[in-house]
Design a protein with these regions (language model features):
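RNA pseudouridine synthases
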Residues: 1-179
Length: 179
């Protein structure tokens, strides 16, 4: 079992499940895993509850992550072998992720943002573009629709960093709605 993850009825939807993986739709305002101030309201708690209700053993093996305020698909491995295979596929970029977001202002029809991301000095959570010490981060975007106030974007990440889309869109002067 996953130590420290208490089974709790946190809502999510199962999109796909087989003997190897579980794919769920994570709602917005749901942290992925327990952290300071979030011990019983996370997706991990909900997944533990799900398996407890089925009477199946549970080890939390989350393959991808999304920010707390982001909704989308999360892939979980149901055993060590599928975790190893899926983790390697993520590292070698065989798994492609496409996101949609709304950003302030009118963005170009398409673009690529190639700017390294690092932790903001003095913060464990916040990230920023940092050309001196950041890790390579690349975002490709395409504008699906726009008006004078905001743009609806489709985004693809070459790399995966914490707050990647949020940081890159703010960097080019088009912060995500709500930021």
């Amino acid at each position: 079992p996953s130590d420290g993850i208490l089974p709790r009825p946190v809502p999510f939807s199962v999109v796909y499940e087989d003997d190897d993986i579980l794919v769920v739709d994570k709602p917005a305002d749901t942290p992925i895993h327990p952290s300071i101030g979030n011990y019983e309201n996370t997706l991990a708690n909900g997944i533990a509850w799900y398996f407890e209700q089925k009477g199946e053993p549970f080890v939390y093996r989350c393959i991808n992550r999304l920010d707390r305020d982001t909704t989308g698909l999360i892939v979980l491995a149901k055993h060590a072998l599928s975790a190893a295979v899926l983790s390697q596929a993520m590292r070698s970029r065989e798994i492609h992720r496409t996101y949609q977001a709304f950003a302030l202002g009118e963005t170009a029809a398409s673009g690529t943002i190639d700017a390294p991301i690092a932790r903001l000095n003095g913060s464990l959570i916040q990230r920023t573009v940092d050309f001196a010490s950041g890790e390579r981060s690349v975002t490709h975007y395409r504008t699906l629709a726009h008006c004078s106030v905001f743009s609806h974007l489709e985004l693809n990440l070459e790399t995966g960093r914490t707050h990647h889309i949020r940081v890159h869109m703010a960097y080019i002067g088009h912060p995500l709605l709500g930021d």
